[in-house]
From Swiss-Prot:
This is Acyl-lipid (7-3)-desaturase. One of its GO terms (biological process) is unsaturated fatty acid biosynthetic process. The keyword Lipid metabolism applies. It is an enzyme of class 1 (oxidoreductase). A motif (Histidine box-3) lies at residues 454-458. It comes from the Eukaryota. GO terms for molecular function: metal ion binding; oxidoreductase activity, acting on paired donors, with oxidation of a pair of donors resulting in the reduction of molecular oxygen to two molecules of water. It catalyses: a (7Z,10Z,13Z,16Z,19Z)-docosapentaenoyl-containing glycerolipid + 2 Fe(II)-[cytochrome b5] + O2 + 2 H(+) = a (4Z,7Z,10Z,13Z,16Z,19Z)-docosahexaenoyl-containing glycerolipid + 2 Fe(III)-[cytochrome b5] + 2 H2O; a (7Z,10Z,13Z,16Z)-docosatetraenoyl-containing glycerolipid + 2 Fe(II)-[cytochrome b5] + O2 + 2 H(+) = a (4Z,7Z,10Z,13Z,16Z)-docosapentaenoyl-containing glycerolipid + 2 Fe(III)-[cytochrome b5] + 2 H2O. Its EC number is 1.14.19.31. It is a multi-pass membrane protein. A motif (Histidine box-2) lies at residues 217-222.
């Protein structure tokens, strides 16, 4: 299709070009055809995740040094209509006609200055943005630990030794996930896009699907942390079926996919059993990975959709679908069939369940404390833009722009020291919705795969987690300079207990008044 730079292309037309061999995307109101660029893209085919989507967040966060205007012009084919800005009819309704394709603003200096300072710090310390010998050593040790644990699980006494080996397998699988595949599927494990792809495949090795994880984490959680889509939220509260054609990717499936079993957002309708979620929640966390492996992954490849996120950019390709099923079959062979053959069916299935429960518990513990804890913000799309009535403050539950640190930051802006930055700035929202723990610690940074530096990771997902403790002080000082919240807890254990208390508060507070009306 030949079009000019100024030709208007409706977003619904962009949405239709969502296949690996026909990929359009929208960035800052301009439309690009990246189909041919994907084969030569320095980051590999991760660019295809943008197919058919509003991709400003992906573009900004994965290009720390920026992109040449000449490259952008080469693939630009038009612009979004004025007043639409990438929004479909449903978005225009919920955003009250706002012109932005996404509900974030990008006009402040905060993120630009942060990028410049981070790049300068890494250059000063001689650290590459991706890769590093520490990652390779750790990856080798983790893979040896994973396969050794699997071997011992299949050969030791199933009544004791094999159980310990299964728990060990779960722990190593969790850290393969946080320390190898996480960086790999973010394009941050190595400079080589092929090495990153192999690192990303280690998630398939432990039983889950790296491609499904991309939709859940890269397209869902990272751009829209702790935010719930209005239409999606209304569906969950009222029980009314939502037309998936009207749904976009603007929601956080990583955090809120446990509803109604758990209430992790103040906009969700409260059920009677939520008052006990701080008690049963830690047990539920253990089922996180087995649910993903057995049900979620398969559902996504069959429906070509993860909740409200379109998955055609991967699963419209027979090659990707074949890879999915081949990897699933292989993991069933060595993680289920082999233990059942060596230890007997009952013991084999028991050991598989123990391994996954352990893996889920470790992963959920280190992940949930970063986003579900007192002090973080929650919001719907409308609340971020202020088109909804100001949210009611609830004890222990903090809607967007209403945490103590945010209020103090706003108050301090009247002075001459702190620079002003809008609270709906994308980078600010990431700081509002994330929490660090054990900051600056080399040990915890490596042990958790960088999850303890969650704010740094969310603003720069394309950086290797090996770099986070080198740039942590840059983040903290820049946030203070701009009056942006930077919440950090002294340890994982402190964060964990605060998370449990926050679960108790969420389970006992009344449903946010706007959702009560909607229901």
């Amino acid at each position: 299709m030949t079009v000019g730079y100024d030709e208007e292309i409706p977003f619904e037309q962009v949405r239709a070009h969502n296949k690996p061999d026909d990929a359009w995307c929208a960035i800052h109101g301009h439309v690009y055809d990246v189909t041919k660029f994907a084969s030569v893209h320095p980051g590999g085919d991760i660019i295809l995740l943008a197919a058919g989507k509003e991709a400003t967040v992906l573009y900004e966060t994965y290009h720390v040094r920026g992109v040449s205007d000449a490259v952008l012009r080469k693939y630009r084919i038009g612009k979004l209509p004025d007043g639409q800005g990438g929004a479909n009819e449903k978005e225009k309704r919920t955003l009250s006609g706002l012109s932005s394709a996404s509900y974030y603003t990008w006009n402040s200096d905060f993120y630009r200055v942060m990028r410049e300072r981070v790049v300068a710090r890494l250059k000063e310390r001689g650290k590459a943005r991706r890769g590093g010998y520490e990652l390779w050593i750790k990856a080798f040790l983790l893979l040896v630990g994973f396969w050794s644990s699997l071997y011992w699980m299949c050969t030791l006494d199933p009544s004791f030794g094999a159980i310990l080996a299964a728990m060990s397998l779960g722990v190593f699988a969790a850290f393969v996930g946080t320390c190898i595949q996480h960086d790999g599927n973010h394009g941050a494990f190595a400079q080589s896009r092929w090495v990153n792809k192999v690192a990303g495949w280690t998630l398939d090795m432990i039983g889950a699907s790296g491609m499904t994880w991309e939709f859940q984490h890269v397209l869902g959680h990272h751009p829209y942390t702790n935010l719930i889509e209005e239409e999606n939220g209304l569906q969950k509260v009222s029980g009314k079926k939502m037309d998936t054609k009207l749904a976009d990717q603007e929601s956080d499936p990583d955090v809120f996919s446990t509803y109604p079993m758990m209430r992790l957002h103040p906009w969700h309708q409260k059920r009677w059993y939520h008052r006990f979620q701080h008690i049963y929640g830690p047990f539920i966390f253990g089922f996180m990975t087995i649910n993903k492996v057995v049900t979620q992954d398969v559902g996504v490849v069959l429906r070509k959709r993860l909740f409200q996120i379109d998955a055609e950019c991967r699963y419209a390709s027979p090659m990707y679908v074949a890879r999915f099923w081949i990897m699933k079959a292989l993991t069933v062979l060595y993680m289920v069939a082999l233990p059942c053959y060596m230890q007997g069916p009952w013991h084999g299935l028991k050991l598989f369940a123990i391994a996954h429960f352990t893996c889920g518990e470790v992963l959920a513990t280190m992940f949930i404390v970063n986003h579900i804890i007192e002090g973080v913000s929650y919001a719907s799309k409308d609340a971020v833009k202020g088109t909804m009535a100001p949210p009611k403050t609830m004890h222990g539950v903090t809607p967007m722009n209403n945490t103590r640190k945010e209020v103090e930051a706003e108050a301090s802006k009247s002075g001459a020291v702190v620079k002003s930055v809008p609270l709906d700035d994308w980078a600010v929202v990431q700081c509002q919705t994330s929490v660090n723990w054990s900051v600056g610690s080399w040990f915890w940074n490596h042990f958790s795969g960088g999850l303890n530096h969650q704010i740094e990771h969310h603003l720069f997902p394309g950086l290797s987690h090996e770099t986070y403790y080198h740039i942590q002080d840059v983040f903290q000082s820049t946030c203070a300079e701009y009056g942006v919240p930077y919440q950090h807890e002294p340890s994982l254990w402190t964060a964990y207990w605060k998370m449990l208390e926050h679960l108790r508060q969420l389970g006992n507070e009344e449903t946010h008044e706007s959702w009560q009306r909607a229901a």
